[in-house]
Amino acid sequence: NEIIQLTEAEHRQAYADDSAMERVVRLAEIVEQGDLDGRDGKDAVVVLVDDGGGSGTFYHLAVLLRRDGTLENVATQLLGDRILIQSVAIDDASHGITVHALVREEGAPMSAEPEVQVTMLYLVIDDRISPVRRSVSSPVDTTR
């Protein structure tokens, strides 16, 4: 669990002082607000994109709870490598987080396009993201 600070929606870190390779973590355009803990004030979830300069691009769900009027990142959950996030939603009644994404079929090469619809449901319990359910639909037709 590494702590990083985003500046202007991203974090850049060279692997070594003389290295041209760098890790870039950036805030994706997906930001959703709602009630995640039953307390006053809007909490938020955001998607972070972690590109280490290699072949992988890792997507993370970050939970920001409102504490003393300020949003604080309390937990982060890996969603997947080179997936396509379609939507993120917060259910104020259940305090649940729903993520809809396209992933690859199990056993498919990482070079294959994500085409399997997945719905992931999470709850925030004691400042941790707890996976509740993951449902998979049949592959979508990407030829249309």
For each predicted feature, which ranges?
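Flexible low-complexity loop/turn motifs enriched in small/helix-breaking residues
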Residues: 1-36, 40-41, 55, 65-67, ...
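Acidic, small-residue rich beta-repeat scaffolds with periodic aromatic anchors
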Residues: 1-9, 16, 86-144
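Beta-propeller blade repeat segments, especially FG-GAP/WD-type strand-to-loop junctions
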Residues: 1-6, 56-77, 122-126
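Acidic/hydrophobic-patterned starts of short beta strands in beta-sheet-rich repeat architectures
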Residues: 36-48, 93-100
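Short, surface-exposed coil-to-beta transition loops
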Residues: 45, 56-60, 82-85, 114-119
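A short, amphipathic edge element
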Residues: 22-30, 77-86
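Beta-propeller fold detector
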Residues: 72-82, 131-136
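Short glycine/acidic-enriched loop and turn motifs that connect beta-strands
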Residues: 50-54, 104-107
